[in-house]
Amino acid sequence: MVRFAHTVFAMPFALIGFFLGIKAAGGFDWLLLLEVVLCMVFARNTAMGFNRWLDRDIDAMNPRTSSREIPAGKISPRNAMIFIVVNIILFIATTFFINRLVFYLSPIALAVVMFYSYTKRFTPLCHFVLGCGLALAPIGAYLAVTGEFAVLPVVYSLMVLTWVSGFDVIYSLQDADFDSGKGLHSIPQWLGIKGALRLSAAVHVLTALLVFVAGYLQGAGLMFAIGSGIFCVLLARQHSIVKADDLSKVNVAFGTFNGVASCVFAAFDIVDILFGNANFI
């Protein structure tokens, strides 16, 4: 029901936020790192579990998703809801041991990631709500360490928002006809496949600009430049392999390219945060 492989989209940026916080506040804490990782897992479980539970009837009608666990009868709706509630409790309980601000904000974070599942019922901007949910990763991890807001992690969050929204538009191309037939909303259903691809590309141009802004504010060095270069190349590459008349590589663009891009970027960026000392951007 929950694809842990998709955690690679947000988890690397949570780690970036964590190490930005460490650099700002000082003092590495293994227990705090574990708590941040657990929060990411519990939030992901809640969001994805709730999406599967809420969309179970829709998924049953869609040939692409009819084999998912709930419509296929492998997991009952009741057991899925128990899984969701347990992860909500674990998420909030874990934030209690981090700091007061994160604990107080935890219900809001859960509300955002769960609200996404409703949005395709009434707005084609649902992809941007998903982006907002994953964008909580870097700022949330930063708050876990420092207990206060700052501009740089917010820029990273905006970067995640645009990046995720753009590739989710590409992913949803597969369901454009189904969405139209069932009265569901998405960018492809609204703008058509060609229009959706153009919008996704424009949003990813904004992502690339935000990468540059983050590097500038961070006083980033060579490692960041290498990581961000690879990230942007992979970002562009996914747009070159998905065509309006050929959607066969959507899953490669969605999963492989973006998963590799986030992990590579985070690895280089974290090294730069911890050990870089010469401005490059």
Predicted regions span which residues?
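Intramembrane alpha-helical segments
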Residues: 1, 38, 68-155, 236-243, ...
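Membrane-interface helix starts
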Residues: 3-11
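Multi-pass membrane catalytic core of lipid/isoprenoid biosynthesis enzymes
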Residues: 8, 34-40, 56-106, 181-225
